[in-house]
From Swiss-Prot:
GO MF annotations, alphabetized: galactosylgalactosylxylosylprotein 3-beta-glucuronosyltransferase activity; glucuronosyltransferase activity; metal ion binding; protein phosphatase activator activity
Site feature Interaction with galactose moiety of substrate glycoprotein, where: 227, 318
EC assignment: 2.4.1.135
Topological domains annotated Lumenal: 29-335
EC primary class: transferase
Similarity annotation: Belongs to the glycosyltransferase 43 family.
Binding-site list for UDP-alpha-D-glucuronate: 82-84, 113, 156, 161, 194-196, 308-310
Related illness: Multiple joint dislocations, short stature, and craniofacial dysmorphism with or without congenital heart defects: An autosomal recessive disease characterized by dysmorphic facies, bilateral dislocations of the elbows, hips, and knees, clubfeet, and short stature, as well as cardiovascular defects.
Main location: Golgi
Organism of this sequence: Homo sapiens
Effect on the protein of changing residue 223 to S: In JDSCD; uncertain significance
Gene behind this protein: B3GAT3
InterPro entries per UniProt: Glyco_trans_43 (IPR005027), Nucleotide-diphossugar_trans (IPR029044)
Protein name as catalogued: Galactosylgalactosylxylosylprotein 3-beta-glucuronosyltransferase 3
Subcellular location: Golgi apparatus membrane; Golgi apparatus, cis-Golgi network
Length: 335
């Protein structure tokens, strides 16, 4: 056993000596190691350069976001709103004015159905912060709705909308606010916004660049979830409506806007108070555009951005009872 261990140890010693001698011999031989070392150094240099570039990009400030056009460069939106005295008038006008205040480059034409300007409307306009023109015209007695009469018997707001068109065409009549009409060449769009509808701010940007007459759907109108144009390949080919679809323009008053230059080029185009039921919008649009040339907006008329809402008429039974007792609400407090 001892002999075997001795032989193993001797063999290990001889192999180690042989390996050492071989290594010593190789140290004296020439070695072509420089090219691989140079390649490795170049790779390290390229990596260092890329790291420096990435660090510089991280330190660089982000690019400024694209800026929207300056307000002065935007076409003006002229919003025409007829209004009349009633208990909810101020509430309606406050809501609408605060929506309009979110829209840049907007001019509000508020037209009262009255003999003269009322303190309520004058004060509201002055406090609104909006660029406005205050107009007044009284609806003729023969065209007024009687108590309890349905709204379709006489279309409301005809005289008031036409009064606003007269002002835009330079025929005067302003009783407050901006009294000078837009100068020739003004780029703008005219929209007829009733005081009781609900409007998305997006709607006004959809209409701003109207070239002729633009259109879109209106929600909660005509006994339907919405009414609006039907669009195919970017063109209006029909209308989704239940009430008399054969009308020349079966659209709601809130569902279109007209380029200001087009209205000024057609000085006789206005609303006809004698138009058949449901044809009031058509009485104006028929003078301005062919249905095939309507400009669909709101994602090809697939989005509803305005709603034909109605505020419930307040019930004043308790107020009337207190008034009979001489204890009615203070009339000096404006509501």
């Amino acid at each position: 056993m001892k002999l075997k261990l001795k032989n193993v140890f001797l063999a290990y010693f001889l192999v180690s000596i042989a390996g050492l001698l071989y290594a010593l011999v190789q140290l004296g031989q020439p070695c072509d190691c420089l090219p691989p070392l140079r390649a490795a150094a170049e790779q390290l240099r390229q990596k260092d350069l890329r790291i420096s570039q990435l660090q510089a990009e991280l330190r660089r400030p982000p690019p400024a976001p694209a800026q929207p056009p300056e307000p002065e460069a935007l076409p003006t939106i002229y919003v025409v709103t007829p209004t009349y005295a009633r208990l909810v008038q101020k509430a309606e006008l406050v809501r609408l004015s605060q929506t309009l205040s979110l829209v840049p480059r907007l001019h509000w034409l508020l037209v009262e159905d009255a003999e003269g300007p009322t303190p309520l409307v004058s004060g509201l306009l002055a406090a609104s912060g909006l660029l406005f023109t205050h107009l007044v015209v009284l609806t003729p007695k023969a065209q007024r709705l009687r108590e309890g009469e349905p709204g379709w018997v006489h279309p409301r707001g005809v005289e008031q909308r036409n009064k606003a068109l007269d002002w835009l065409r330079g025929r005067g009549g302003a009783v407050g606010g901006e009294k000078d009409p837009p100068p020739p060449g003004t780029q703008g769009v005219v929209y007829f916004a009733d005081d009781d509808n609900t409007y998305s701010r997006e709607l006004f940007e959809e209409m701003r660049w109207t070239r002729g007459v633009s259109v879109w759907p209106v929600g909660l109108v005509g006994g339907l979830r919405f009414e609006g144009p039907q669009v195919q390949d970017g063109r209006v080919v029909g209308f989704h409506t239940a009430w008399e679809p054969s009308r020349p323009f079966p659209v709601d008053m809130a569902g279109f806007a007209v380029a200001l230059p087009l209205l000024l080029d057609k000085p006789n185009a206005q609303f006809d108070s004698t138009a058949p039921r449901g044809h009031l919008e058509s009485s104006l649009l028929s003078h301005l555009v062919d249905p095939k040339d309507l400009e669909p907006r709101a994602a090809n008329c697939t989005r509803v951005l305005v709603w034909h809402t109605r505020t419930e008429k307040p019930k004043m039974k308790q107020e009337e009872q207190l008034q009979r007792q001489g204890r009615g609400s203070d009339p000096a407090i404006e509501v």
